[in-house]
Amino acid sequence: MADLNTIVDQLSGLTVMEAADLVKKLEEKWGVSAAAPVMVAGGAGGAAAAAPVEEKTEFNVVLADAGANKINVIKEVRAITGLGLKEAKDLVEGAPKEVKVGIPKAEADELKKKLEAAGAKVEIK
């Protein structure tokens, strides 16, 4: 068991480049590929399809189009993001752009309502 601890200590001291080189040498010596396990796991599609789908917890609010009332949309984007006037204007005029990223569903729905009330077309992804 002491030998394994020594090996672990030595491997922990490797740089990223040294670790990559070690992987290549082991692949050559043993005649395997690091990508092989991925292909084996991909072949079990039936079991993977039966697994429950994870519910998405983080959403992105995307401004699809500013609409006809750009000034109100710019004001709302500034209020939501805290951006300056120029940055908010650039974001609105550069649509489609992400307004907020990685937020909960409830907050994303609230921001969508606010932006749509200002005249924008909004998507939640």
From Swiss-Prot:
InterPro entries in the cross-refs: Ribosomal_bL12, Ribosomal_bL12_C, Ribosomal_bL12_C/ClpS-like, Ribosomal_bL12_oligo, Ribosomal_bL12_oligo_N_sf
GO cellular component terms given for this protein: cytosolic large ribosomal subunit
Q: Which Gene3D superfamilies match?
A: 3.30.1390.10, Single helix bin
Similarity annotation: Belongs to the bacterial ribosomal protein bL12 family.
Tell me which HAMAP family the record gives. Ribosomal_bL12 (MF_00368)
Q: Which PANTHER family match?
A: 39S RIBOSOMAL PROTEIN L12 (PTHR45987), LARGE RIBOSOMAL SUBUNIT PROTEIN BL12M (PTHR45987:SF4)
Protein name listed in UniProt: Large ribosomal subunit protein bL12
Species name: Anaeromyxobacter sp. (strain Fw109-5)
Q: Give the encoding gene's name.
A: rplL
